[in-house]
Structure formats: structure tokens, C-alpha cells
Swiss-Prot record:
One Pfam family cited in the UniProt record for this chain: Herpes_U30
Ion transport recorded as keyword: no
Identification of the protein by name: Inner tegument protein
Similarity comment text for this entry: Belongs to the herpesviridae inner tegument protein family.
Keywords attached to this entry: Host cytoplasm, Host Golgi apparatus, Host nucleus, Virion, Virion tegument
Function: Plays an essential role in cytoplasmic secondary envelopment during viral egress. Interacts with the capsid via the large tegument protein/LTP and participates in its transport to the host trans-Golgi network (TGN) where secondary envelopment occurs. Modulates tegumentation and capsid accumulation at the viral assembly complex.
Chief location category: virion
Annotated region (Interaction with large tegument protein), positions in chain: 489-965
Known partners and oligomeric status: Interacts (via C-terminus) with the large tegument protein/LTP (via N-terminus).
Listed GO CC annotations: host cell Golgi apparatus; host cell nucleus; viral tegument
Length: 965
């Protein structure tokens, strides 16, 4: 609809209406298809609309003519996506101002009425209150807490709710003015993190970052004087895929310095941001959520060489802060059942002060979801508990910010916040059946949906009651207000009161004759004949007939129940059904006796069907996950059941149970797309992980062989002799090639787990949506109107999704516990620095008996005290050896991996070693060994000690000294 012509079109449709019924039908449609507010800025258009309402015998039309401001603004909308953007708020206020001016300029002004001059809904009162409200909106400072609510006379106006919601939304989405903790001046890393966070908050407030120059200077200092803070990708076993936060943090620092990295090197070759003992010791726990790259590394078992006690002390400080933060949140949110702005402001300020923004909640949630199971959490003290509290707070924070964006004292927020609460509850329940450690329930300790009730606005019952009472001149208008309050606020009070029309004992809606007019002049037979001759769309009736005490039961028997049965059995098409339902609501709407209690649920059913048919099927998002109350379909069942029951009370002998064919078809049309989408997601997940899992199994098996194989180290050539084949054979692998292969295998497994976890996250959203529909179905299954819920079979869909999630968890658990997951740790000796450095070797080569002593060397040499029993290498086949397939796979991983050599081939050439004898010139006896007898050596300490160093033998030392360099 063209916004500028919408009121013109409405006036034209009213002019074309041939009778009262058709006029009212046009007006009732505004309840579900609102009018554009922009078209109310012209008094000429408003006057043209009022001129079409010339039927002076109807109370509803008279109400509209006398109170056009209330009526038109009640059904007017800004016509834009709500909430309005912050930049559109002043334009929206301008539209309201133009509408007020247009109503004030109406010539002639609306007719006077017998109502008191101070009637709440009078034009003058509405326009005065609206002008005051506009002035208040213009004076608002959105950086300060907002507490305003619409005035009593404006609470039911759609456009007022929309602009109220938009102003509150603008306040909540702007960062609060908070005092950030002072960063530790001794830590350049923390100063950078804190300043960059403060700059981001300033940019969000449309302010230039105050510390831009200091940030640039800090970045240069970090890159020049703190180079060891950055870990090259070639050093760590993780990659930018498994450490994306560390990579992104490093990129942010490099980007502050012009030409820090040429071309696209920043994306490919930049290091990751690490940390050192000094950084962890200086870290302030108040900034725990700015250190996401630290937690990311710890969860991937990467400590960058930091001392264990340093890491654990850092975790202990963070844990204490998180416990205190959680206690504050619980205190602020417990025992609150309705909207509590002060508590919301306090929690928001506390979150922003420690860096827990909406983006940080999503960052931590994703990081914790893709973190490998087990690993460091079982080795580092306090890490498991800290991760539990991080998960608990960030899960709550994610839903907190979702509610915050929807928070206001309006029915719009009431509906949206309830959806978030239901989604939070479903998501919380969806994690328990399949995730690891579900029994511990880290994020399940808080009743998140209960704490979020601080966002749920309370219905303004007193204001609604005043509005309802002020509309007493038209029972039909009161009925529409009661219906809208029921629909918007889920409040039954005024919906029930609207059934009790004055003077009719609940059986009339005004008119001149109440419930008994014409009863003495019209027989039941005449009323029955009239009702049996009615067809949908008829508008003519005799007043004495519709006001007869026989009209309601005869109309219900001959018209209402047959029409309802035809609709509910699905015998009429959609547009025909809506037409007939609307006719049942509006036929003799203010004159007929005894039908009010039936027409009101039919009115709600009509609006609900219009909404459902307008939206089409629901997908797997929030709509599907929403609710334990049955959602839109549950409301529809309630309305039809109420109308059918009321009609049966008039005609006890007619009809049976409520037909369900239409409602079952609506259920299927609503949820069939979701079922297809969820099954497609499961199929896509299995298709995606199948090649990954196959490759993962093979890599894990090869890694197991490498871990359990026995190696010979050829020190002269720097090769590892790796067993190969069932027959005694081997592959001589250069140590650098072997190390690179091991690193690639481990990082590939970690990357595969990240990809699987990301796919699992998507699947879990579908699983949560499926649980939401099943939760809704539990309500529908207990409803008096019994639907056929067998198709789609969401129980089968749930089992399919759950099977996929369990399969992922099984794969992830096995992978995390495999040799491949920690392959570099198993071969840690290869990655350690050499025990004898180049400087020591030079001292050995340049040794002078007159100048130097050999104490340091002799102390490291011990006489072997035992012989290690071993199987003969030449004769016995190795228990763990690579096969041809393994070798092919290893060469695909690292093309430098060499080909095998069968036993008996020429070994690598080595330089003959020259055995030297030690003299007693330093008063040390010569060590003599039979090297033919002692094929291998081992060192057994007298006391149990833990050493990260490898021992050397005399033979190896001789080879190192006399070999080629």
C-alpha cells in the first residue's frame, strides 16, 4: 500500500461500500492491516475519511466520527521495520507532530457527543496528551537511563507503542557510560587491550577514539620491544583456524602500524598473539573478558612456555572475579517477575566494565563450543572451574543482550521477550542429552529463563481499564479493545469484561431492543425461517428478528455451527473461509442478541488466521523454538474451542467434538518446512563429516603406530629409523622432516575438530528448534481439540539430530584422547633445544688442559648399571610398523617424507668415529666400556626425579665430537 495514499484508499473503499456490513468489514481489517501514519498528516484526507461514515444509526461509526484521533492513531503504524533506527527517531517524532497538527486543523471539528468533556478518548484530550508526549521525546537524553511509559490515554495506540519501543531500543543499544578499571601500567599488553576496548566503546558512541595516538604508539612498542609476545605460526602447533582469536588480535596490532606487513602477508604469515609469564602475572582479573586469546590458547593446550604455577595463579584470580560477578547477577535477577530497569542498568554496566559486550558473549560461546574436549582442562588447576563460570555467564549474557535489544514497557516487548525466554529454556534443555559432562551441567546451574524475567513488562492494567471504560458508547469498540488487549498482552480481564454488554445480560451489543426486542411479535418459526435463508455475505435483516430471544440459538443451529464445521473440516478454500468467518463476526454486529460471547473468540481466530496465513510456514528459527504455550496454533485452538463450546451451549443437541482437519493441515503447513530443513541439515552434516571422519581415523591410526613404534636414532646422519612393513624394514627419516610431519598431523587433527565443531554448532540450533516444536506439541497433545500430530514426526527428527550430535561427540572424544591429538608432546624430546649447545661444542673442540676443566662434562656421564632386555631387531618383525598405505598417506601429508629401505640395503654413510681415552690428568679414572656387549644404555637415577632433558652416552658424545660438522 502506498503510504501517502493509504487513507485515500480506505476512504474510497468506504465510499464504495453498499451497506453498513461492508463498511464495518473494511474498518475491522485495520485491526490486522494497520494504516500508514504518514497519511494522517493531511487534514483534508482525514475529513474525507470521516465524511464516508455517514450512518448515524450505528454506535461504532458514531464513535469513530466523534473520536477520530483515538481511532485512527490506534490503528496507525510507522510502516517501517520496528524498532526504528536511531537516525530515524526524530523523523518519526516529526510524523507524530504532523498528525497532531492535522487533527487540530480539521474543519469542521468532530461532532460533539453526549459524553463528558473530560472523556479520556476525546480528541482534545488525546491531542493534548500526545503533544506532551512528543515534547518529552524531544527532550530525552538517550545516554541516560530511560523510564518513560506512554500516558494512560495512549497505551493502546499502535504508533505510540512503536515509537516508545524504538526509543528504549536506541538507549539499550548505545554503550553505557561506565568507568573502566585502570589497566596495569607494567603490562603493555593489558594497556593495549584496555585502550582498544575503550576506543571501540567510543566509536560505538559516534565519538572519535580518544587514545588513537597512544594506541599507535603502543602497537609500535609491542612490535619492536615485545617481539617475544608474538608466536610465529611455524613455532606453535596450532594454526589460524584453531587460534582465530590470537590471530585476529595480532592482526589488530599490526594494522595500527603502517606497512607493518607487505601485501597480504598479514593474512598469511603474521604471527599469533601469545603471552608470557610477566603478562599473566600482571593481568587484572577485572579485564578477564579481554583476554579471550589466553583462554583460547589454554583450551588448546598452548601455554607458550609459561610456568604452570603462573598459569594457575592467573586462572585462580579470574575464577574469583567470575564467582563474584556471577553472585552479583544472581542477586540482581533473582525473584524478579517483571520489568526492572534499575537492575538491568546495573547488570549492563557491570558487564561493560569487564569487557563482556554482546560480541564478547558470542566470541566466548563460540570459543568454548569449538574447544577440544579434555586436554588441558584436566591438567591445569582451576581451568575447568573457570571455563564453567565463563560458559555460565556468557550463556546468560548472550540471552541478556537479546532481551536488552527488545526491552521496553510495551506489548511489542512483552511478545518478543517471551519468545527469547522460551528459546533460552529450550536451548538450555537441548544441551543435556548429548554434550560431554552433561551431568556436571556447567551452564545449567542458572535458571536463565527465570533470571531474564527482569525484561518482561507488566501489562498497564489500570490504563487499559480506563481506556476500556471510556469506550463504553460502543460495545463493538469495547469488544475490539478487549480482543486487542488479549492478543497483545495475553490479558483475559478485559476480553472477559467485554462479553458483559450493558442492558443485555451478556446477550446484546447495544441496539434499541436489548435481548428481547420484538419477542412478542416474531415467532420462533419466523426466526428459524430467516436464519435458514441466510447466506454468507448477506447484510439485510429485520431488527425485530435479530433482537428476538430466539435469534441466537436459531442462528447458531442453522448458520454458525454448519459454517464452522465446514471451515474446520477444510471444505472451503482459504480466502472463502476468511470471508465467511469475518461475516459471522460482523453480521448484525451491534443489533443481534446473544452472540457476543461467540463472536469475540471468532474475532481472535480471524486475526490469528490472518497472521498465520500472512507469515506462511515457520522455519527452524525462534518461531519454531518458541513455546510451551503452543504458540500461534495453540491460540487458534483456544479460540475455535471457545467459540464452538459457546455455540454448543445455545444448541446442545447439535454438533459433536470440534473438527480438526483444518487445524491439522495448518499444523502441517506450519511445521513441515521446519522438519524438512532439520532433516536436510542432518543429511548435510553427515555428508560433510564423512570424509573428515574417514581421514581422521586414518591419521589417528598412523599416529598410534608412530607413538608405539621403536626407533633407532642415527646420530651421525641425524635420521630416525622408522619400522616399515611386516618384514624387517625401515624408513630413514631426517629428524626435521619427521618433526614437520608430526606437527602437520597434530595441527590437521585440531583443524578437523574445529570444522566438525562448527558444523555441530549449526546442527545444535536445528536440534534446539526441534525440541521447541516438541515442547509445543506436548501442549497441543493435551488440548481439548485433538490434532493429528503424527506428521511431521518430530520425534523421529529429534532422534536423527540427536544421533548426529552424539556421533560428533564420540568422534571428538576419541580424537581428543588419541595419540595424534598430542603427538608433539609424545615426541617432545625432538622439539626440545639441544642439550649440548653450539657454544658447548666449540668449547669441547677448543679444549685446553692447561686452561679448562672437564668437571661439567664428566658429571653428566654415568657408568651404565643395567642392560635393557630387547628383542632382536634383525630377526623379529616389529610390533608397530608402517605399511604401504601409511607411507602413502604420510607422503601426502608431507611430500618430503622419504621412501622405505629394506633391511640389508646400504645404510647411510657415516664418518668413522675415533674413540678417545680420557687421562687421569684431572684426577678422574678412565671409563672403559665393552660396546659390543652394551648395545643400548639407560640412566637410572638414585632418587625419583622429573627431568625434561635427554641423557647422552659416551659413544654418542664421541660421535658428536669426532664426526663431520
Amino acid at each position: 500500500m502506498n503510504p501517502q495514499a493509504s487513507l485515500d484508499r480506505l476512504a474510497q473503499r468506504l465510499s464504495d461500500a453498499e451497506n453498513l456490513f461492508k463498511k464495518v468489514r473494511v474498518l475491522v481489517d485495520l485491526e490486522s492491516a494497520p494504516l500508514s501514519l504518514r497519511s494522517l498528516s493531511d487534514p483534508v484526507r482525514i475529513a474525507s475519511f470521516l465524511n464516508t461514515l455517514s450512518d448515524r444509526g450505528n454506535e461504532y461509526l458514531a464513535f469513530i466520527r466523534h473520536r477520530p484521533a483515538f481511532y485512527l492513531l490506534r490503528v496507525a503504524s510507522f510502516g517501517e521495520q520496528v524498532p526504528l533506527g536511531a537516525g530515524d527517531l526524530q523523523g518519526a517524532v516529526g510524523l507524530l507532530t504532523s498528525a497532531v497538527r492535522a487533527f487540530k486543523d480539521l474543519k469542521p471539528p468532530p461532532e460533539g457527543t453526549p459524553a463528558p468533556a473530560n472523556n479520556l478518548l476525546e480528541n482534545s484530550n488525546i491531542l493534548t496528551r500526545l503533544s506532551q508526549f512528543i515534547a518529552h521525546l524531544r527532550s530525552l537524553d538517550l545516554s541516560q537511563p530511560v523510564t518513560f511509559t506512554p500516558p494512560a490515554s495512549l497505551v493502546t495506540l499502535r504508533c505510540i507503542e512503536e515509537i516508545t519501543f524504538s526509543f528504549w531500543h536506541a538507549h539499550w543499544t548505545a554503550p553505557p557510560e561506565v568507568s573502566l578499571p585502570k589497566p596495569n601500567p607494567q603490562s603493555k599488553l593489558e594497556r593495549w587491550l584496555a585502550l582498544s576496548y575503550a576506543a571501540a566503546l567510543g566509536a560505538a558512541r559516534d565519538n572519535a577514539p580518544k587514545h588513537r595516538r597512544e594506541l599507535r604508539a603502543l602497537a609500535k612498542s609491542l612490535l619492536t620491544t615485545e617481539r617475544d609476545l608474538f608466536a610465529p605460526v611455524s613455532v606453535v602447533t596450532e594454526t589460524s583456524l584453531t587460534l582465530p582469536l590470537a590471530k585476529e588480535r595480532a592482526r589488530e596490532i599490526f594494522s595500527m602500524v603502517d606497512d607493518a606487513l607487505p601485501g597480504d602477508a598479514a593474512a598469511r604469515g603474521a604471527p599469533v598473539l601469545g603471552f608470557r609469564d610477566a603478562d599473566l602475572n600482571a593481568a587484572s582479573p577485572e579485564y578477564v573478558f579481554l583476554y579471550e586469546h589466553v583462554f583460547e590458547a589454554l583450551l588448546h593446550d598452548q601455554t607458550y612456555g609459561c610456568a604452570r604455577r603462573t598459569v594457575e595463579a592467573f586462572l585462580e584470580r579470574c575464577l574469583k572475579f567470575l564467582v563474584n560477578l556471577g553472585s552479583y547477577v544472581q542477586t540482581a535477577c533473582s525473584n524478579k517477575s517483571h520489568l526492572s530497569p534499575p537492575e538491568i542498568e546495573g547488570v549492563r554496566a557491570a558487564f561493560h566494565a569487564c569487557g563482556l559486550t554482546r560480541e564478547a558473549c558470542h566470541t566466548f560461546s563460540t570459543m568454548l563450543a569449538i574447544a577440544p574436549a579434555g586436554g588441558a582442562a584436566s591438567r591445569l588447576k582451576h581451568l575447568h572451574a573457570t571455563v564453567q563460570h565463563l560458559e555460565q555467564i556468557t550463556v546468560f549474557g548472550r540471552h541478556f543482550y537479546e532481551c536488552l535489544r527488545r526491552c521496553s514497557p510495551t506489548s511489542i516487548s512483552h511478545r518478543l521477550v517471551r519468545e527469547v525466554l522460551r528459546t533460552a529454556q529450550v536451548e538450555q534443555n537441548s544441551a543435556t542429552p548429548w554434550t560431554a559432562g552433561a551431568a556436571e551441567g556447567s551452564a545449567l546451574g542458572w535458571p536463565v529463563h527465570s533470571y531474564l524475567r527482569i525484561f518482561l513488562p507488566r501489562p498497564p492494567e489500570d490504563d487499559l481499564a480506563a481506556t476500556f471504560k471510556a469506550a463504553s458508547e460502543s460495545n463493538f469498540m469495547k469488544s475490539l479493545i478487549g480482543v486487542s488487549v488479549k492478543r497483545d498482552w495475553d490479558l483475559n480481564k478485559f476480553y472477559v469484561l467485554s462479553k458483559k454488554a450493558p442492558g443485555g445480560g451478556g446477550n446484546g451489543e447495544g441496539g434499541s431492543g436489548g435481548g428481547n426486542g420484538g419477542a412478542g411479535t416474531v415467532s420462533r418459526k419466523q426466526v428459524r425461517k430467516f436464519c435458514e435463508g441466510l447466506n454468507p455475505g448477506d447484510a439485510d435483516y429485520a431488527l425485530e428478528v435479530v433482537q428476538s430471544k430466539y435469534f441466537a440459538p436459531e442462528f447458531a443451529r442453522a448458520v454458525l455451527l454448519p459454517e464452522l464445521e465446514a471451515m474446520l473440516r477444510g471444505r472451503v478454500r482459504r480466502h472463502v473461509m476468511l470471508f465467511r468467518l469475518r461475516w459471522l463476526v460482523l453480521f448484525a454486529f451491534e443489533d443481534a442478541a446473544g452472540l457476543a460471547h461467540i463472536r469475540r473468540p471468532l474475532t481472535l481466530a480471524y486475526f490469528q488466521l490472518t497472521e498465520i496465513f500472512g507469515q506462511g510456514g515457520v522455519g527452524s528459527g525462534a518461531g519454531a523454538a518458541g513455546g510451551g504455550d503452543g504458540g500461534a496454533l495453540g491460540n487458534l485452538l483456544d479460540h475455535f474451542h471457545e467459540a464452538w463450546t459457546a455455540a454448543r451451549e445455545l444448541v446442545p443437541e447439535a454438533g459433536g467434538e470440534v473438527p480438526h482437519e483444518l487445524l491439522t493441515n495448518i499444523y502441517r503447513s506450519l511445521h513441515a518446512p521446519a522438519a524438512r530443513e532439520q532433516l536436510a541439515a542432518a543429511a548435510a552434516f553427515l555428508k560433510e563429516i564423512k570424509p573428515l571422519v574417514e581421514g581422521t581415523w586414518n591419521m589417528m591410526r598412523i599416529a598410534s603406530v608412530l607413538c608405539h613404534a621403536r626407533y633407532n636414532y642415527l646420530s651421525a646422519s641425524g635420521h630416525l629409523r622408522v619400522p616399515f612393513g611386516e618384514k624387517p624394514g625401515y624408513v630413514d627419516v631426517p629428524v626435521p622432516v619427521f618433526k614437520e610431519t608430526v606437527k602437520i598431523m597434530e595441527s590437521s587433527l585440531h583443524e578437523t575438530l574445529v570444522i566438525l565443531s562448527q558444523a555441530c554448532q549449526d546442527l545444535q540450533r536445528f536440534y534446539a528448534a526441534c525440541l521447541g516444536i516438541l515442547d509445543q506439541n506436548q501442549f497441543l497433545a493435551t488440548h481439548p481439540v485433538q490434532l493429528d500430530l503424527s506428521e511431521p514426526d518430530f520425534q523421529a527428527v529429534k532422534e536423527t539430530l540427536l544421533g548426529c550430535l552424539r556421533r560428533y561427540r564420540e568422534v571428538a572424544s576419541l580424537a581428543a584422547g588419541s595419540c595424534c591429538f598430542s603427538l608433539t608432546r609424545h615426541f617432545g624430546a625432538l622439539f626440545d633445544p639441544p642439550l649440548i649447545t653450539e657454544a658447548v661444542v666449540r668449547k669441547v673442540l677448543e679444549f685446553s688442559e692447561e686452561r679448562d676443566t672437564t668437571d661439567a662434562f664428566i658429571e653428566s656421564l654415568q657408568q651404565p648399571i643395567a642392560k635393557v632386555e630387547e628383542e632382536d631387531w634383525d630377526d623379529a618383525p616389529p610390533k608397530h610398523a608402517l605399511n604401504d598405505y601409511d607411507l602413502t598417506a604420510l607422503r601426502e601429508i608431507n611430500e618430503s617424507f622419504p621412501l622405505p629401505k629394506q633391511h640389508g640395503n646400504n645404510p647411510p654413510e657415516t664418518t668413522p668415529s675415533i674413540k678417545l681415552s680420557y687421562t687421569d690428568s684431572v684426577n678422574v679414572s678412565q671409563i672403559t666400556l665393552d660396546w659390543e656387549k652394551f648395545l643400548r644404555t639407560s640412566y637410572i637415577p638414585q632418587d625419583a626425579i622429573t627431568s625434561e632433558f635427554s641423557h647422552i652416552t659416551v659413544k654418542k658424545l664421541e660421535q658428536s665430537i669426532t664426526g663431520s660438522f
